[in-house]
Amino acid sequence: MTQETITTDVVIVGAGPCGLFAVFELGLLDMKCHLVDILDKPGGQCAELYPEKPIYDIPALPVVSGHELTERLMEQAAPFGPQYHYNEMVEEVQKLEDGRWRVKTDGGLVFEAKVVVIAAGGGSFQPKKPPIPGIEAYEGKSVFYAVKRMETFRGKNVLISGGGDSALDWTINLHPIVQSMQLIHRRDGFRAAPDSVNKMHALVEEKKMQFHLGQITSLHGDNGQLEGVTVKGNDGADYQIECDTLLPFFGLTMKLGPIANWGINLHENLIPVDTEKFQTSEPGLFAIGDINTYPGKLKLILSGFHEAALMAQAAFRYANPDAKLTFQYTTSSTSLQKKLGVA
């Protein structure tokens, strides 16, 4: 059976914060959006990897979780009726003779749109796993590479391994609810915010947690339940650490996947864009958020919001070259307020 083609103004690849806010900005310009995401829910990396981790640099929100931010963005986009397609990976993006784009997914969906916006974060992320023999047997049971629900770890004896921001942040955020908290790193220098490092050292001094120097060489347990680990200390001696949960945080590996085959210019697995339109090397194909690169780029959610606003203006002009675009403010425009359902 032939899949019916879905016709729309815009296809957004990625339903993370930048993709969701792009719906709002495009909606103000009467552009209808379909979003496609490989995950089974909205929020992208923000919701998948750290849904309960506090975010502190969203304007007007002193602190917000990834989950709450996603919910608010969904609510903000709702008046424009976006359509979401989860568990779908965009495999092919092809420009048609009439200037529109044909987008195909691995699940058989076919779209035709005037504009395509790539808001796929860094592509798909996979955790870098430590080279510990047999760790696969514990994964998802007592070894976890991300904290999706803090309550999962309440009352546990947790060992966190790593020296970056994720390791330090979760050491600090989880310690109030766990039975015991231990952190292990191969050296006493950290690749994390100095404030987080200071907080961790303070917890150690207050005997609220322990810090170890060394590397984990083996795991001990039964039927996927961890009971402890063997560590080779920096002095070369082996010793044991008792724990029932291990959180290794060694960073993420980014994979572009099919994006690399879409015929657009790439630079170090990122998509170069201009900072006026956030357009790629292909007219009508835009990129916002962590997937793009330009001089002075900051990989921040708030930067992606700015990019979405400018992209939307350029996307409208590309899709409607003969239309007049009058800039309006939501605070004073009755027509925009009607679209938002507040007038």
Swiss-Prot record:
Reactions it catalyzes: 2 reduced [2Fe-2S]-[ferredoxin] + NADP(+) + H(+) = 2 oxidized [2Fe-2S]-[ferredoxin] + NADPH
GO MF: ferredoxin-NADP+ reductase activity; flavin adenine dinucleotide binding; NADP binding
Keyword Oxidoreductase attached: yes
InterPro entries reported for this sequence: FAD/NAD-bd_sf, FAD/NAD-binding_dom, Fd--NADP_Rdtase_type_2, Ferredoxin-NADP_redctase_2
Subunit-structure text: Homodimer.
Family (UniProt): Belongs to the ferredoxin--NADP reductase type 2 family.
Protein name: Ferredoxin--NADP reductase
